[in-house]
Amino acid sequence: MTRTAKLLLVPILLLQILFFIFMALHRFIDGDEGFYLLASKLVLMHKKPYLDFLYEQAPLLPYVYALWMKYFGISWNSARIFSALLTTLLGTLLYEHVCRQTRNWLAGLAAAVLFASSTLVFAWFPVVKVYSLAELFLFAAYVAISRLSSTSPRWLMGASGLLLGLSVDTASYLLLLIPVFLWWIFRNSDAGARRPSILWFLGGFTIAMVPCLYLFISSPDAFVFSNVGYQAIRTNAGLMGMWSEKFIVVLMLFIGGPPGNGIQNSILFFIALGFIFSIRRPRYPPRFAFQIAVIVAVISLLPTPAQQQRLCLCVPFLVVSAVCVVNDLFVTLESRRQRLLAAAACVCLLGIYLAGSANDLRKYLITGDGIPGVRWAHDKDDWRLRRVLEVSQAIDRVASPGEMVASFWSGYIFQTKAVPSLGFEADYGLAIAEKLTLQQRVRYHVLSPAEVESNFAAHVPRIVVVGNQYSLGDRMRYTAETSLRAHGYTLVRSIGDTSIYVYYSKP
């Protein structure tokens, strides 16, 4: 890195911290954040994913967030600030890598701006989901392996394997990237160093897989169901179906749609695609970054249903490939006129890119239009952090410390003194319950609607919270509230579109 690049490192770090923490504290809540946070709280209570509660992802995230919350508080603000810090670390690593690759601080600055202003980044990384943690590990693995040379230490490949393994521990579908990394090592290592480099890489990856291996050995069936089986049955199309939907998601990625604009993704992708293969330099990391971006996009689209938000994992790699290739082509221009025209074109594209995110910022911070889950809500303020905390405080007023509460959305229980009723640890279990046998439901910690009805009839638990069950729909809400009233539960508080029911035993 040049001296100027090093001087800019701290300001870029601080500006990202301010921006991403602002986004984390003011963005509408995503529905999945509830069960990720509750899973992290359960880990703090010495419970294990798969073995003690339903958890439909690789297991690392709840452990990492639990460790953070152990020291910085069990709260929405604490967890979201942690996500913002992870995103900041990712953006800073991106800046450092581009500066090192191009030896140009201006290219690094452009990369940081493109990263932070991408809708897919500011909308999905600073929230409590797998994206920021998995991407930080994945991008760090890429940075480590991109520095492979005849003089690089062997442990660097071990570190890359370890980091890739940690990303797989967070989002299991990234396992499919292993062949891509192995191919890069094979193609770019000296003949005598290929085998040791690959072994070091695989050794690091194996070490990272130890937690997953432990949980798999403890309950192979529950582990496989949570990471693969759930995705296969959550829709009627199977694990990798609904191809027309995937095509629409790809189309919206480039032309725009309700979740965000398409111009930013089009600029990054087509600039990289148009020029990346014109640079014949061997061991060219930006080309590897582009390959990772494309393969991650394909992998992310495979599970059903396809979700555009998963493609946020491609953005840092597209930024690297686009910025580096433009910089490398720019330095080959000989005349001053050519350089001025190229610089003007870059400034123009940057302006268009930044303008593309203006309306999306308004969506995710103010209106909620087009945001998954929020746009269908009867009261969009139910997905504001202040409203969720208001409901949690109301629960604490009627529940004793440690009392079990059934909430149809996990997020309401997280920042309370209560604990989730058995089977309500994950709010999406009810949606798939009728596709499972009784034995499977017991093994995976899932309740069926009939079992929920039976529990309400027995007045178990005493407190039930109905609201924000976006994955279940209005019909489930109507059924639940009808059952609660029929079995003597009393509505004690309504906050927005959320209701708290309590059963008071008769003397």
List PLM regions with ranges.
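Membrane-interface alpha helices of multi-pass inner-membrane proteins
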Residues: 111-112, 155-172, 178-181, 206-207, ...
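Hydrophobic/aromatic-rich transmembrane helices and adjacent perimembrane loops
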Residues: 131-134, 176, 297-337
